[in-house]
Amino acid sequence: MSSAYSVRSFPVSIPAVIMETDWTEPWLLGLLAFHLLCLLLTCFSSQRYKLQIGHFLCLVVLVYSAEYINEVAAVNWRLFSKYQYFDSRGMFISLVFSAPLLFNAMLIVIMWVRKTLTVMTDLKTLQEERKERRRRRKEE
């Protein structure tokens, strides 16, 4: 079976990578399932702060490790893949591995910012109510 693309002629654009990838390979389907599980954990961990922090740190560590994972996968691709997808620039690993993880991390940060704004709004409301009660007591 011929290669989807060789390392020398690896596509430089995201649409080319997406179009030339065999998305039916079992390891890619497993990676997709992993990303879906990460997304579910991101969504359902919003009420469990410690779990969300741990999940966020795992996401960041995995993204940080992507270069090493790419190097190992480039050497051992025949063990799990039909084609050599792992180029020296890291385009493929960035697209199929790091980008979804960074998306999850971004969602978590958005949740944290939203939660912080909600707490700040609630605090300001309580301060205003307290100020109003003091003013009323003073008038009496």
Curated annotation (Swiss-Prot):
Gene Ontology, cellular component aspect: cytoplasm; nuclear membrane
GO molecular function: DNA binding
Any Pfam family: TMEM18
Spans through the membrane: 26-46, 53-73, 92-112
Keyword Membrane: yes
InterPro entries in the cross-refs: TMEM18
Motif extent (Nuclear localization signal): 130-138
Protein topology in the membrane: Multi-pass membrane protein
GO biological process: cell migration; eating behavior; energy homeostasis
Membrane topology, Nuclear segments: 47-52, 113-140
Coiled-coil ranges from the UniProt annotation: 118-140
Subunit architecture: Forms homooligomers, independently of the DNA-binding domain.
Protein name in the entry: Transmembrane protein 18
